[in-house]
Amino acid sequence: MRYHLLGWLVLCIGCSSAPIGNTGIQTNTYDSSVYVWQKIMDSAQWKKNYNFQLFSIRDTIWTFHPDGNWYSADDGQHWVKSLLPNSIHNLAFLDYIVFKDAVYGLGYFEGNIETHLFKPHIYRTRDMQSWEVLTEQSNLPKRFFYHPFVFKDKLWIIGGEDERQQFADVWNSDDGIHWVKQLDQLPFGKRSGSVVVQLKHKLYLLNNDVWSSADGVNWVKETDAIVPGEQIFGYAALVYDEKIWLLGCNRNGQFSSQVLVSSDGKKWEGMDAPWSPRGGIAATVHRNKIFMTGGKYGGTPDHTEFMYSNDLWVLSKKNK
């Protein structure tokens, strides 16, 4: 494992109100918000890939990767491959989630959109060494391309799709096994790939637009577009320093390294980052820092081949 520590790269969200590039995003000054990115390593132990996950659990950071799972107890400086295997199989279609001090695997997916095998298995690990199959016959909705989230001590699912259609419903569960549909025909319509985060006491559903909710069922639109005039997708979303952060955005079909930040889901500022443009990254908040790795770049007329990443970066708030 190679370690490459850059000097501190100080990145402020704005010192002026000038637009960044041609994005329509304005930079504004946060009174006490000065952030720094630090590269921990050029190449982590896991293979270069995208659409996998990072977790923070019990003061340890975990990488859940298609080829296995790794953990670090020293802020990403050293990693150990775990005996814990990949249970849900295709991480591009389904997610793991931390719930009640354990990691849950919701379903099993093998194949692609057109031809696949889906099983409503529910997996759980508490010791981070082996999986317990809670059931092979849950009523987990048969779908993919959704991102489960935790709210009010329950697991939640919004939207997603199967091989025929997208959905506009919301489900929740106390245990991951028994799922109850709370509402259909949500006001934002059928969609998949939305990310839901909790900022303070409200949920924010993020796609190209932004909706908020205090109860997970009733939703209010905050903005029609995160970046007016652009289509934004493929990002990782998380909450850090009482703000929503979007990392690894695809903007109008072009991958970007600019991070988008908002304190209310309505107004968004851009912050340039030193890592290469990419989408499909893995990110988490751990010990009051943002950790990110993975992702892919390419698929455009001027860069037809995809390039994948496994470098590891950390963002923290600079002490004054």
Which role does the model predict for each range below?
Residues I13-G14:
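C-terminal motif of bacterial Sec signal peptides marking the signal peptidase cleavage site
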Residues R2-W8:
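Sec-dependent signal peptide recognition
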Residues P19-K320:
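Kelch-like beta-propeller repeat domains
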